[in-house]
Amino acid sequence: MTAIQHFFKTFFLTELLKGLALTGRYTFKRKFTVQFPEEKTPISPRFRGLHALRRYENGEERCIACKLCEAVCPALAITIESETRADNTRRTTRYDIDLTKCIFCGFCEESCPVDSIVETQILEYHGEKRGDLYFTKEMLLAVGDRYEKDIAAAKAADAPYR
């Protein structure tokens, strides 16, 4: 760019006028606003929300304590302790997720070989205190039990893409 071109761009404020033209173009377009608590937008089938632990049909928890989800978690939000049962299978004694650390990346769900840990489509949850967002095994199993039909339907719909 020559010095003369630079002078004219600076003197006539062409960059500023381009920005104002862009702003003016969107000023008169129809606005899209959602009044959130009353109105809701559709959620993607692959939305990653609140975690849940699933059970088999016979009521036994699916988690085999392989600890892959704990190893793959980039935020170190998952803590697992396990013990070996009499039939030489492992089961978790402690499975905790700290949602204040979790970045909802979905790696835990992808790494699970038995589809035990899943991320549901629940997005409306809160905590009054920091400790309210620390989910224990019992809390995660309760979420899984309550929303098992929705979780199974979402897994079935996503099966061709896995």
UniProtKB/Swiss-Prot annotation:
Domain 4Fe-4S ferredoxin-type per the UniProt entry, residue ranges: 54-83, 93-122
Binding positions for [4Fe-4S] cluster 1 per the UniProt entry: C63, C66, C69, C112
Cofactor note: Binds 2 [4Fe-4S] clusters per subunit.
Names of the cofactor(s): [4Fe-4S] cluster
Compartments it resides in: Cell inner membrane
Domain of life: Bacteria
InterPro entries: 4Fe4S_Fe-S-bd, 4Fe4S_Fe_S_CS, NADH_quinone_OxRdtase_chainI
GO molecular function, one term: iron ion binding
Gene Ontology CC annotations of this record: plasma membrane
Residues annotated for [4Fe-4S] cluster 2 binding in this entry: C73, C102, C105, C108
HAMAP family: NDH1_NuoI (MF_01351)
Protein name according to UniProt: NADH-quinone oxidoreductase subunit I
